[in-house]
């Protein structure tokens, strides 16, 4: 992950699932928020903070206080995780509200709030392991571990109907979509035939293996 690839990958997948191209781009850009702090295995913090403050005067100040650069970077990571975790908890709700307001039949803000318990739960499922990982392991893994753990929790509970609202919401009929909602990708995705099926464990195996070895290297 990192360098904007999650949004670049997620938006076409959402279009293939039936989202409008404009809506998929909007949601993809919104989700590029909380996790970005520790994207690319912590590059913004590890490189940005260390290179940004590593002046002789600052290093001397750290030495005088008995703090190493590594300890300082980890402290920055924890504080950033807490601040961004608070806003990240609300991000799923904001995404749904924006979707119902700008891409729903009724153009309603409040329709999106009907799923508030579920979206708050989804946000917490990501941000709690996100903050804990920053505190325990440092800046390399909060986004990676938070995303994988959150996905596992929400997928498991959703299959069992936990906090899933009884009412369903959908986009307007495709024939009523304004022209600026769609792109050529919509037409191409509709024309794609059936592909070979891949099991979920096989599809997720590369990401899980990568996460395992990255975490193992820091223990």
Feature map (PLM): residue ranges:
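Hydrophobic transmembrane alpha-helices that form the pore/transport pathway of multi-pass ion
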Residues: 1-113
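Long, contiguous bundles of hydrophobic transmembrane helices that form the permeation core
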Residues: 89-219
């Amino acid at each position: 992950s990192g360098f904007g690839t999650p949004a670049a990958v997620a938006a076409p997948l959402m279009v293939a699932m039936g989202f409008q191209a404009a809506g998929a781009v909007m949601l993809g850009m919104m989700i590029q928020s909380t996790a970005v702090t520790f994207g690319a295995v912590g590059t913004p913090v590890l490189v940005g903070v260390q290179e940004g403050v590593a002046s002789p005067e600052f290093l001397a100040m750290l030495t005088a206080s008995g703090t190493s650069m590594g300890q300082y970077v980890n402290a920055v990571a924890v504080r950033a995780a807490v601040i961004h975790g608070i806003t990240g908890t609300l991000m799923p709700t904001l995404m749904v509200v924006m979707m119902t307001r700008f891409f729903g039949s009724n153009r309603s803000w409040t329709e999106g709030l009907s799923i508030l318990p579920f979206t708050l739960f989804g946000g917490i499922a990501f941000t709690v392991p996100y903050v804990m990982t920053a505190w325990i392991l440092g800046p390399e893994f909060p986004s990676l571990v938070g995303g994988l753990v959150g996905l596992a929790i929400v997928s498991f509970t959703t299959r069992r109907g936990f906090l899933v609202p009884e009412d369903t919401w959908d986009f307007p009929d495709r024939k009523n979509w304004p022209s600026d909602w769609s792109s050529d990708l919509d037409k191409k995705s509709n024309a794609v035939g059936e592909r070979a099926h891949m099991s979920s464990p096989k599809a997720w195996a590369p990401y899980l293996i990568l996460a395992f070895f990255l975490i193992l290297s820091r223990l």
